[in-house]
Amino acid sequence: MASSSDSEDDSFMAVDQEETVLEGTMEQDEEPHPVLEAEETRHNRSMSELPEEVLEYILSFLSPYQEHKTAALVCKQWYRLIKGVAHQCYHGFVKAVQEGNIQWESRTYPYPGTPITQRFSHSACYYDANQSMYVFGGCTQSSCNAAFNDLWRLDLNSKEWIRPLASGSYPSPKAGATLVVYKDLLVLFGGWTRPSPYPLHQPERFFDEIHTYSPSKNWWNCIVTTHGPPPMAGHSSCVIDDKMIVFGGSLGSRQMSNDVWVLDLEQWAWSKPNISGPSPHPRGGQSQIVIDDATILILGGCGGPNALFKDAWLLHMHSGPWAWQPLKVENEEHGAPELWCHPACRVGQCVVVFSQAPSGRAPLSPSLNSRPSPISATPPALVPETREYRSQSPVRSMDEAPCVNGRWGTLRPRAQRQTPSGSREGSLSPARGDGSPILNGGSLSPGTAAVGGSSLDSPVQAISPSTPSAAEGYDLKIGLSLAPRRGSLPDQKDLRLGSVDLNWDLKPASSSNPMDGMDNRTVGGSMRHPPEQTNGVHTPPHVASALAGAVSPGALRRSLEAIKAMSSKGPSASAALSPPLGSSPGSPGSQSLSSGETVPIPRPGPAQGDGHSLPPIARRLGRHPPQSLNVGKPLYQSMNCKPMQMYVLDIKDTKEKGRVKWKVFNSSSVVGPPETSLHTVVQGRGELIIFGGLMDKKQNVKYYPKTNALYFVRAKR
């Protein structure tokens, strides 16, 4: 019934609408209304009636590749506007690079197309005829560094990877080659490859082959030449008119070259020009930039293990003898730190390099955080911790132990010590040696740690009052207790660590030096200077030079598990670990160890750091299950991530004044994703494309691909 009534209502409404339309039509026939004509005219307007400024703004959102080409076919007006939009896109990008006003875009899996294999030291170039970036060869990050000879095409309109199955004579698998564009051909030259694992001790193989690839025919061709350069890799090349100029490179057996070779791309013949004057040092891995038809810029390079160059040279290709000209580099301290493994690309009157960002300057983009270098001559001062939990802070504090290769702390071999029975045992703390961290990131302050005794709020307590004295030559087993922390959660327990094997070898007390008037931080009148501090850890003065080992996270975790098991049995177990303190009548503020021997107890002092004697990793392992080293934080916010930053070199005064200048940016937009080396940088239409590279193994980044990363750098809107 309900359905029938609804259908009837619908039929009535339809009839009413038809009658209304008919009446309106009759009224229009009888007496037309100018308002309806105006409304009909307004609905029939097209985009051609829009102001050109508005239409040009709308067209600026199109992709500068295929969408521009398609829009230009609509009409003459759109063709003219698209030309203006393309001009503004290019010059707007050049201005954005000069001012550092850029934005980053990353392409991570999954995205359309077959994912390309991770690689570095590959070759890449931009081919404008089909608006694509071609990638050839490279190495993979494996034990054997296997090389590839595959060719990939990135469609920049759809951002899709396509592997063309070409015919002809394929090149050998190699890396470190150069790929340049000449007319409708891609020219591949040089390269190297690792030897096979068997037989052993084979040298690397270098190539002097020339291959051309035709994208229109999908065909590889091998070019045979004579009297050419030796086999090389890591060289640089560029095309000017119908010549390919090749400079430098590695020749194998730790030999570098600074020769210049010219390949006639019409006759496929090699020649070596005469060059007068001083020349750059032999190098490889440099960048080669075309200034004009008669000038080439050489930037950076590597001449060997201890020869990393940051210089700049001009090669003048006159009609007579060619000549080298060294350039003055201004603001070198603001330049790219490593030019030999980070290629450069020209954008307008600037050269862009993407290299490692300075420590502590800016975080990763968009949400990765950088960390300063863990190597420091003077450890930073420890400050009291705020009430916020560490897991809620996006940036770790400086007093935390560094994460090296995905592990916390520093693992060192255990020293062997002689026991009274003659057997050798491993100890977490070896015998006397140079000062070194005992607990990475922990804090044992003079007011909270002492030998053989403890104050009321000290985290160091003796295991037993009947411990043998230092004069008898025995080691003292110091039990460390985890004191309650200010601002901690209510369910946090007072954990006392009494099973950590820290052996502090004490010298016998001298009977000639009295105890009266001595500082409370000394034992037997030795070591009058203040306590030493090693890597942010305060230790007793005579102990700082005697500790050379480090407590591993595994030992701390096992100790904490044992403490939890003992604390769960009741307060009696924890009370056995920390007996009540007593004072010897012979020396106030000290505890008796044996007859006639006293060890002073330090007075209560202000807590160093957050008042704990264990490093932060131990405290986190005590509060959280050891599932991840980044407890309570996203895995992509690793403290070992080194961000990549855009560096811009101004080359407008290169020929007139003989200088280049690194630009200084205060904007954080120039800092991008994690740093990669041996990647490629290619300029497209109003953007830069960064692909691949070798990421440091210490960078524990989960949300970014390691060596098949694809980034786009564009002007910020």
From Swiss-Prot:
GO CC annotation, single: SCF ubiquitin ligase complex
Boundaries of every F-box domain copy: 44-93
One MF annotation (Gene Ontology) recorded for this entry: ubiquitin-like ligase-substrate adaptor activity
Composition bias type Basic and acidic residues, residue spans: 31-43
Chain intervals for the UniProt region annotation (Disordered): 1-47, 361-472, 508-539, 570-635
Pfam families xref list: F-box-like, Kelch_3, Kelch_KLHDC2_KLHL20_DRC7
Biased segments, Low complexity type: 363-376, 570-596
Compositional bias segments (type: Acidic residues): 1-30
InterPro entries: F-box-like_dom_sf, F-box_dom, F-box_only_SRC, Kelch-typ_b-propeller
Residues with PTM Phosphothreonine: T378
Domain of life: Eukaryota
Biased composition (Polar residues): 416-426, 455-469
Residues in Kelch repeats: 132-184, 186-242, 244-293, 295-342
Modified residues (Phosphoserine): S365, S373, S552
Keyword field: Kelch repeat, Phosphoprotein, Repeat, Ubl conjugation pathway
CDD domains the record matches: F-box_FBXO42 (cd22110)
SMART domains listed in its UniProt record: FBOX
Subunit structure: Component of some SCF complex, composed of CUL1, SKP1, RBX1 and FBXO42. Interacts (via the kelch domain) with p53/TP53; interaction is direct.
Role of this protein: Substrate-recognition component of some SCF (SKP1-CUL1-F-box protein)-type E3 ubiquitin ligase complex. Specifically recognizes p53/TP53, promoting its ubiquitination and degradation.
Name this polypeptide is given: F-box only protein 42
Source organism of the structure: Pongo abelii
